[in-house]
Regions:
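Short capping/connector residues at structural and topological boundaries
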Residues: 33-34, 43, 81-82, 92, ...
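Alpha-helical scaffold segments that flank or form the walls of functional sites
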Residues: 93-159, 186-187
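Metal-coordinating catalytic core of metallo-dependent amide/deamination hydrolases
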Residues: 14, 151-187
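Hydrophobic faces of well-ordered beta-strands that scaffold small-molecule active sites
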Residues: 79-85, 140-141, 161-164
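Short loop/helix-cap segments at secondary-structure boundaries that form the rim of catalytic
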Residues: 56-65, 152-156
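Glycine-rich beta-alpha junction loops
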Residues: 87, 147, 168-169
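N-terminal metal-binding scaffold of metallo-dependent hydrolase/deaminase domains
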Residues: 1-62, 75
């Protein structure tokens, strides 16, 4: 049996007392260096952390009190990473489809100026994060405005996000430009 105990669970008393859940599917993509695809296998999870991957029978034997959920005709795989997102822009979906970059900017930038506020970015980011998680994306690198709001929205949804400050040649929707934006970033 292939088993990987995550270090966060090995020393945590509460994690060790958490119930074990076993998930199985027709196929498990390990995304290892050999692109191994497992069949008749499962993943054991405790306190939200994968603690073992291996043959289903072995995991059920090792964790007799675990709950087991099988996904017929399905694939279990690691979450995907979207390394270039503008999550908050989901509010403009359909506004400038099938346009070249300049046409896109000519349509979207005035719309952004009219509606970009913390609340609109929060709602749009949460909607995009929910859609992303539903599609198997667990992590995003987001480049948009109000990074603290983006982090909070993704946290509410349960999606990891990396983001940072957007710098423009003028005052942006956050009400800061140039050195004020840099000072805010450094705090």
């Amino acid at each position: 049996m292939t088993s990987h105990v995550h270090p966060e669970t090995s020393g945590s008393e509460s994690a060790l007392n958490s119930p074990v859940e076993i998930f199985s599917a027709e196929w498990i993509l390990t995304v290892d260096q050999n692109d191994t695809v497992l069949t008749e296998s499962a993943i054991a999870v405790q306190a939200g952390v994968i603690i073992a991957v291996g043959p289903l029978a072995d995991l059920l034997r090792a964790h007799p009190s675990a709950t087991h959920q099988h996904f017929d005709q399905s694939v279990l795989m690691p979450g995907m990473v979207n390394a270039h997102t503008h999550l908050g822009m989901t509010m403009f979906r359909g506004l400038a489809d099938d346009r070249n970059l300049q046409q896109f900017l000519d349509l979207v930038m005035p719309a952004e100026a009219a509606v970009l506020r913390e609340q609109s970015v929060s709602v749009a980011t949460a909607a995009a994060a929910l859609e992303s998680v539903h599609a198997g994306v667990t992590t995003a690198l987001d480049m948009y405005y109000f990074p603290d709001v983006v982090v909070a929205a993704c946290d509410r949804v349960g999606m990891r996000v990396m983001t940072g400050t957007t710098f423009l040649g003028s005052v942006g929707p956050e009400g800061r430009g140039g050195s004020a934006q840099m000072e805010w970033t450094e705090q």
